[in-house]
Regions:
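Soluble non-cytosolic domains of exported or imported proteins
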Residues: 54-61, 84, 112-119, 145-146, ...
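Alpha-helical scaffolding segments of alpha/beta enzyme cores, especially the outer helices
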Residues: 62-65, 88, 92, 120, ...
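Secretory targeting and sorting signals
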Residues: 1-38
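Structural recognition of the beta-strand scaffold that forms the well-ordered cores
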Residues: 48-52, 74-78, 99-104, 138-142, ...
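Active-site beta-loop-alpha junctions enriched in small/polar residues
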Residues: 55, 79-81, 105, 143-145, ...
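Active-site beta->alpha N-cap acidic-glycine motif
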Residues: 38-113, 117-118, 124, 128, ...
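His/Asp/Glu-enriched short active-site or ligand-binding loop at hydrolase and phosphoryl-transfer sites
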Residues: 146-187, 218-229
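C-terminal domain-boundary segment and adjacent tail
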Residues: 40-44, 66, 70, 83-85, ...
């Protein structure tokens, strides 16, 4: 019996294997959330703002990994004291395609402070984030969502738009992973949800939040400094 066809088949198989291997090595195995976003943009019927307060922390790397694995981008409202102490994590936030924003320096009740003290909290955070490589923030979230005319005025003087939230995940209050997923399911186009960098239950919820948004053709967007609403990344 002739062995010609068998030899030809083996040679073809080896050549195909080489081609497949070459292609695999030429194509990145992972994408950042920012790189993956254009492929999904056509399916987006709206955008929501995922936000995480109080970082960067020891939980930040795991959170960034979860977000990028699930093709999500988010706004990270960093405390200035932690940005100053962890500049590499601020740079990691930016590298992962996240937006970095101001959440005061020490997380005080700003409405109980003088105008000069409020200014110091905001200004020092702007400097800490910029110095860490996070750019100059355009968004500001007052701690506890507490604000008044003075807080808004000082933030505006620094070129910041104040952002509160439409949906509170209650992760700061011990909400379960299921409860956090249900909270995210209430988001509608343009709305913003409050979550926290340090919450283990929130970290566990990220894949299911991504699935829920995709099922409703909603995408994670940036928060517009002009309107304070979530919009397509620009």
């Amino acid at each position: 019996m002739s062995t010609g066809p068998r030899r030809w088949s083996r040679r073809l198989g080896k050549r195909l294997a080489v081609v497949v291997t070459a292609l695999a090595s030429a194509v990145p195995l992972t994408l950042t959330a920012a790189e993956a976003a254009p492929a999904r943009a056509a399916a987006c019927n709206g955008y929501v703002g995922l936000t995480f307060d109080d970082g960067p922390s020891g939980s930040t790397s795991a959170l960034l990994n979860a977000l990028t694995r699930n093709g999500l981008r988010a706004t990270m409202f960093n405390q200035g004291q932690y940005a100053a102490a962890n500049p590499a994590l601020v740079r990691a936030q930016v590298a992962a395609g996240m937006w970095v924003a101001n959440h005061s320096y020490t997380h005080p009740h700003l409405t109980r402070l003088s105008r000069a003290q409020i200014d110091s909290e905001i200004a020092r955070t702007q400097q800490a984030i910029a110095g860490a490589g996070g750019g100059t923030p355009k968004l500001f979230r007052p701690p506890y969502g507490e604000t008044d005319a003075t807080v808004k005025s000082v933030a505006a003087a620094h070129g910041l738009t104040e952002i509160i939230w439409n949906v509170d995940s209650q992760d700061w209050n011990g909400a379960s992973t299921d409860a956090i997923v249900r909270a995210a399911a209430r988001l509608t186009n343009g709305q913003v949800i409050l979550m926290h960098d340090w919450s283990a239950n929130t970290l566990a919820a990220v894949p299911r939040i991504a699935q829920g948004l995709a099922a409703r053709n909603l995408c994670a967007g940036m928060i517009s400094p002009q309107t304070g609403r979530a919009v397509a990344p620009g």
